UniProtKB/Swiss-Prot annotation:
GO terms for biological process: DNA recombination; DNA repair. The gene is ruvB. It holds the Pfam family AAA_lid_4. ATP binds at L22, R23, G64, K67, T68, T69, E130, D131, F132, R173, Y183, R220. This is Holliday junction branch migration complex subunit RuvB. Gene3D superfamilies: 1.10.8.60, P-loop containing nucleotide triphosphate hydrolases, Winged helix-like DNA-binding domain superfamily/Winged helix DNA-binding domain. Its main location: cytoplasm. Belongs to the RuvB family. It is an enzyme of class 3 (hydrolase). The lineage of its organism: Bacteria, Bacillati, Actinomycetota, Actinomycetes, Micrococcales. Keywords: ATP-binding, Cytoplasm, DNA damage, DNA recombination, DNA repair, DNA-binding, Hydrolase, Nucleotide-binding. Residues 184-254 are annotated as: Small ATPAse domain (RuvB-S).
């Protein structure tokens, strides 16, 4: 079973109170995502000028980039109450009807992981978003009747890490869609500077750069690493965090200079030392590192692929040339590079089921 990871983009339950204190409260304080911020500001300002609820908003992108924060900012900018729920919590149309029927005029409803809602609830949401009305079915079989229920105008903010799983009719009902992208190191430094100020931490520029460089382009991870470095500095009696102390702290937590953790390095190490760089099937690779295939596929692989360290081909997973270099191995002649992916033809769906060692 995978250990909790410092570099997971997901939010841990114990982090929620701290994260809430560090969240920006308005678009001006929100760092990064310049394109989405600019577009969203225009949508909200126009809505306020018209005196109407804002259009429904869909935020997509990997975990930890600010989708929940933006939902809270939308409610604050519109001076409206915020109702928070999630797709997994809405498994029946009745669950959604109960939420919708209790909304007040202008209220913002935030549905996290909206792609995980049940199909009956999705179909009810279509009418609610478009006509601000739902039909409540009373009775069963031939005697069932639909009672229309009028809803006050509201703004739905949906968040998803897998926009491709949303049905087209649902996507089309959002007036604004914003895709959040990973942050640059410079943007993460700004996030860390703001958080350090709120936490009353003394960190120099080199310290911010060191932490930002290991944060996988994700503000949530950056803030998490900052708190771990703070703990390390407190125990070691260090008043100002610099690059050396930040590096020592994160090395202790096994987060390396590129943001790889123990599981990431184990996957690459197994590919190189046990399978000569691959290709190897997912199930075999998971056995080699002592984890479940789903853990390797969903926790480790996305970042490794994005960093160009691991490739997925129809024949299985391969270690790219940069993976050999990163782990300190000499790159053998003819080892896999980007041209090899082109030769094999990347096929993620097939690669997920293939279990070939050679």
């Amino acid at each position: 079973m995978a250990e909790p990871s410092l570099v997971s983009g997901g939010e841990e339950p114990e982090e929620r109170v701290i994260e809430a204190a560090l969240r920006p409260k308005n678009l001006h304080d929100f760092v990064g995502q310049h394109r989405v911020r600019k577009q969203l500001a225009l949508v909200l300002e126009a809505s306020k000028m018209r005196g109407r609820s804002a259009d429904h908003v869909l935020m997509s992108g990997p975990p930890g980039l600010g989708k929940t924060t933006l939902a809270m900012i939308i409610a604050a900018e519109m001076n409206a109450p915020l109702r928070i729920s999630s797709g997994p919590a809405i498994q029946h149309a009745g669950d959604l009807a109960a939420i919708l029927s209790s909304l007040s005029e202008g209220e913002v409803l935030f549905l996290d992981e909206i792609h995980r809602m049940s199909r009956p609830a999705e179909e009810m949401l279509y009418m609610a978003m478009e006509d601000f009305r739902v039909d409540i079915v009373v009775g069963k079989g031939a005697g069932a009747t639909a009672i229309p229920l009028e809803l006050p105008p509201f703004t739905l903010v949906g968040a998803t890490t897998r926009a491709g799983l949303l049905p087209g009719p649902l996507r089309d009902r959002f007036g604004f869609t914003g895709h959040l992208e990973f942050y640059s190191v410079a943007e993460l430094e700004l996030v860390l500077r703001r958080s350090a100020g709120l936490l009353d931490l003394k960190v120099n520029s080199a310290g911010f750069t060191e932490i930002a460089g290991r944060s996988r382009g994700t503000p949530r991870i950056a803030n998490r690493l900052l708190r771990r470095v703070r703990d390390w500095a407190l125990v070691h009696g260090i008043e100002q965090i610099d690059a050396r102390s930040a590096s020592a702290a994160l090395d202790m937590y096994e987060v390396d200079e590129r943001g790889l953790d123990r599981l990431d390095r184990s996957v690459l190490e197994a590919l190189i030392t046990k399978f000569n760089g691959g290709p190897v099937g997912l199930s075999t690779l998971a056995i080699a590192v002592g984890e479940e295939p789903e853990t390797v596929e969903t926790v480790a692989e996305p970042f490794l692929v994005r960093e160009g360290l691991l490739g997925r081909t129809p024949r299985g997973r391969i270690a790219m040339a940069s993976a050999w270099t990163h782990l300190g191995y000499a790159v053998p002649a003819g080892v896999f590079g980007q041209e090899t992916l082109a030769l094999y033809g990347e096929d993620e769906n097939h690669a997920e089921s293939v279990d070939t060692v050679g």
